[in-house]
Amino acid sequence: DRIERSKMYRLIPIIAFLVAVCLPRMSHAETLKVCYDQWPPMTMFPSEEAPARGVIIDMLDEIYSSKGYDLEYFEVPLARGLKMVANGLCDMLPEFPASETPREGFVYASEETFAYTTAFVVRRGDPWRYNGIESMKGKRVATGPGWDYSSISVGYQNYLDNPKNAEFVEVVAGYDDVVDRIFNMIKENRVDIYADNDLVLQFVMKRLAMNDTLQIIRPGLEKKLVEKPIFSTKIPPKKRQKLIRTWDQGRMLMTREKETGLLKKYGVIFEE
């Protein structure tokens, strides 16, 4: 018994040393709180059957985890996510349309996630094609709450916002199923057209198996949709700059092959 106690006492300094070494390392792991909305396949709410979080979340996880960050995710609708970032409840939101106009509550990273080509979804056989705002006359358009197209087409966003067009604009609310609902509304002839990121349209069309009833038409809106991460101004400036720098450097170093691999994982490609 005396021998066992002696062994135990000899172990105490070793245990104390290990605790002293390990605790600082454990405390250095910072938690990054990430708010994001459902925009498959770029950002996705996971489930037991489908645990994947999407292209951009995979990208985000790779960049920040490699620098020792723990990522905590909050799956919320876009409008709520923006408020949570502005209020400091989340540190960042991984994708938001880039704009040169300052926005209250957050700042952009320098490096974009992607510059997306847009396209439209219509019922199969519909001869309509986008040819400027005038071509939308009489068409029922779907969009989501808080969605902003002004960075790719000021005219398109003005059309959606104009009270005179209210009877032709359907704002579709939801949690994680807004785009799915819009596709079904087009199929059911409740709305006529919907514009979005081409990759999103490809993914949802394939997942809902609606190729026989709907079609993606190109070209879409005038400019590419440039999206960037946004970071809360509630974060102390030094910490915020470090988070932004980590993203910018990680995104710049990501190879084209890596990008393509992330996209192929979700079965989408950039259409030339």
Regions found by a protein language model. Give the residues of each.
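Short loop->beta-strand "edge-of-pocket" segments that line small-molecule binding or catalytic clefts
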Residues: 30-38, 43-46, 133-151
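Extended ligand-binding regions for polar small-molecule ligands
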Residues: 57-66, 134-140, 145, 228-265
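Short helices/loops that flank or line small-molecule/ion binding pockets
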Residues: 79-91, 134-137, 174-199, 207
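Ligand-binding cleft/hinge of the Venus flytrap
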Residues: 60-67, 111, 147-176, 183-184, ...
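A ligand-binding cleft/hinge motif common to bilobed small-molecule-binding domains
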Residues: 80-86, 95-105, 155, 192-223
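Periplasmic-binding protein-like
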Residues: 37-40, 115-119, 209-248, 269-272
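Extracytoplasmic small-molecule ligand-binding "clamshell" domains
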Residues: 30-105, 175, 265
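Acidic, polar ligand-binding/catalytic clefts
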Residues: 73-135, 146-149, 219-220
